[in-house]
């Protein structure tokens, strides 16, 4: 998961947050300077400020909103890369402690009783207001199940997910083989990804219920509004701001619950059967795993529609919007790189080889698509979810780093990701989208049988130099399913559709836009699609 400002990517009414941010700066500037104690270790320098200063000037705050990429790059090169911590501005009037790369291994080795991921995101997401309780990020067993159970049944989910992708693309890209259709990419892909993700979360037919899907996005957007606006407020005002800005999420939660309830009641009845009963066909989705787990471990939650629905919403929050933005960037990058790298033809050739046996998708088959893998990985490298990663909260008193820095209890910190992934000392020509950057290296490392090497260079691998999924034991457990989803998605699109930029783009990918520390594809980016008369 990414920093708070990343949530801007899904907020439709930018003037709202801009107005609120301006108001925050005016109303709370003196409060933060004179009344709010620093939440970072004393003595850590503030980027672009004189030594010893403990607050950011209006000039530096303004740079965060108007030129954050260069501000954070400056902080990375001057401090983080050299093994030194630094404090940078955050959303609202936040102070963000950035740990140096040299401490990443130490942080990853700390127990959850000392440094917590869950507590960090509980602070950031403020679900106490948007979902009515802290349990959904305080006791995240709905996410733990992805790691402990869902990934082990991934092979059983792949066929249904593939079928749903076909249905969704046929509906939204169309089936006209004669005429080009211009689509607004993000708007269309939000619907496709929501439907596909819901197939493995709650199954069919609820995954095709437009009212249910729209309400889920309403909750997600409301959650992000709450996180941004509430965190931009002083703590004494948060109990007032939180409920006010959470009305959208709460109202949409009620719609989700209403649409979800018939399936919920139906699934409770299935629990009367043993899942291994040969006369009973166990549903294969996240919801069923969740309910089976609750029977044994969360009996107090099992029959509570409100709690189970909101745990499903939490899963949707993690599985929908970031995947959508990645696929938007990926399709734009493929088209933008096609003239130089012949990207589409190379991918279609690999897809044809992979699917020519006519057999269904399997995890093993998807793993052989190293060029498609490279295209996805390069998108995540050059267009990460946010500028920072590995959000953590200190929950142990007296924690001291190996270099002697005392970390205050309840302080938050993170690591740079975007500057690392664009570091010329780590990547050749780092700002260039090179679709086959990693596949060339993996093919060069192939063994005598021609099997590719470089398994540390796959989409789902993590390292200090590649952080879209986080790193270490808390790396995103859903990345294996998302990996399969994106490869099947891309195969279906390129096998069944011709795609191109609108004429006015002149063959050029529209440039990334920056909202504070978040790089996004331009609002309203479009492509043209036409169904192929014959699939490859």
Curated annotation (Swiss-Prot):
Its EC number is 1.-.-.-. Heme binds at residue 476. GO terms for biological process: secondary metabolic process. GO terms for cellular component: membrane. Pfam families: p450 (PF00067). Its main location: membrane. It comes from the Eukaryota. Its cofactor is heme. SUPFAM superfamilies: Cytochrome P450. Coiled coil: none annotated. Keywords: Glycoprotein, Heme, Iron, Membrane, Metal-binding, Monooxygenase, Oxidoreductase, Transmembrane, Transmembrane helix. It is found in: Membrane. Pathway: Mycotoxin biosynthesis. The chain crosses the membrane at residues 17-37. It is a single-pass membrane protein. GO terms for molecular function: heme binding; iron ion binding; monooxygenase activity; oxidoreductase activity, acting on paired donors, with incorporation or reduction of molecular oxygen. InterPro entries: Cyt_P450, Cyt_P450_CS, Cyt_P450_E_grp-IV, Cyt_P450_sf. It is an enzyme of class 1 (oxidoreductase). Glycans are attached at residues 125, 321, 387. NADH-dependent flavin oxidoreductase; part of the gene cluster that mediates the biosynthesis of ilicicolin H, a 4-hydroxy-2-pyridonealkaloid that has potent and broad antifungal activities by inhibiting the mitochondrial respiration chain. IccA to iccE are sufficient for ilicicolin H biosynthesis and the roles of the remaining enzymes, iccF, iccG and iccH within the pathway have still to be determined. Belongs to the cytochrome P450 family. This is Cytochrome P450 monooxygenase iccF. It comes from Talaromyces variabilis. The gene is iccF.
């Amino acid at each position: 998961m990414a920093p708070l400002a990343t949530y801007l990517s899904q907020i439709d009414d930018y003037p709202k947050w801009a107005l609120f941010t301006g108001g925050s700066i005016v109303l709370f500037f003196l409060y933060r300077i004179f009344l709010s104690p620093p939440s970072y270790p004393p003595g850590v320098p503030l980027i672009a400020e004189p030594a010893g200063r403990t607050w950011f000037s209006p000039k530096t705050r303004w740079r965060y909103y108007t030129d954050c990429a260069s501000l954070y790059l400056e902080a990375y090169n001057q401090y983080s890369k050299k093994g030194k911590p630094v404090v940078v501005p955050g959303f609202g009037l936040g102070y963000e402690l950035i740990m140096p790369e040299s401490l990443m291994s130490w942080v990853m080795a700390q127990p959850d009783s000392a440094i917590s991921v869950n507590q960090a995101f509980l602070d950031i997401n403020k679900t106490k207001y948007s979902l009515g309780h802290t349990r959904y990020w305080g006791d995240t067993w709905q996410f733990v199940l992805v790691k402990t159970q869902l990934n082990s049944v991934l092979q059983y989910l792949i066929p249904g997910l593939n079928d749903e992708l076909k249905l969704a693309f046929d509906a939204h890209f169309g089936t006209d083989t004669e005429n080009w259709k211009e689509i607004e990419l993000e708007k269309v892909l939000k619907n496709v990804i929501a439907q596909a993700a819901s197939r493995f979360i709650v199954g069919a037919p609820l995954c095709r219920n437009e009212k249910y899907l729209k309400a889920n996005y309403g909750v997600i957007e409301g959650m992000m509004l709450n996180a941004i606006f509430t965190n931009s407020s002083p703590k004494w005002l948060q109990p007032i701001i939180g409920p006010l800005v959470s009305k959208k999420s709460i109202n949409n939660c009620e719609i989700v619950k209403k649409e979800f309830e018939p399936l919920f009641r139906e699934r409770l009845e299935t629990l009367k059967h043993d899942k291994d009963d040969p006369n009973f066909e166990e549903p294969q989705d996240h919801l069923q795993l969740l309910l089976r787990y609750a029977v044994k471990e969360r009996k107090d939650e099992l029959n509570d529609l409100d709690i189970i629905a909101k745990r499903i919403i939490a899963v949707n929050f993690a599985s929908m919007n970031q995947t959508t933005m990645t696929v938007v960037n990926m399709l734009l990058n493929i088209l933008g790189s096609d003239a130089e790298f012949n990207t589409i033809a190379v991918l279609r050739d690999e897809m044809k080889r992979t699917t020519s046996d006519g057999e269904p998708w399997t995890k093993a088959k998807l793993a052989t698509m190293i060029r498609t893998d490279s295209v996805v990985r390069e998108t995540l490298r050059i267009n990460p979810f946010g500028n920072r990663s590995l959000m953590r909260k200190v929950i142990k008193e007296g924690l001291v780093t190996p270099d002697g820095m005392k970390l205050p209890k309840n302080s938050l910190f993170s690591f740079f990701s975007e500057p690392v992934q664009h570091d010329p000392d780590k990547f050749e020509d780092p700002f260039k989208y090179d679709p086959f950057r990693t596949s060339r290296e993996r093919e060069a490392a192939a063994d005598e049988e021609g099997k590719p090497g470089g398994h540390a260079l796959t989409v789902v691998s993590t390292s200090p130099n590649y952080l879209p999924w986080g790193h270490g034991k808390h790396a995103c457990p859903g990345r294996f399913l998302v990996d399969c989803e994106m490869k099947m998605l891309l195969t279906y699109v390129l096998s069944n559709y011709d795609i191109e930029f609108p004429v006015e783009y002149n063959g050029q990918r529209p440039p990334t836009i920056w909202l504070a520390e978040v790089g996004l594809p331009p609002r309203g980016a479009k492509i043209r699609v036409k169904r192929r008369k014959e699939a490859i």
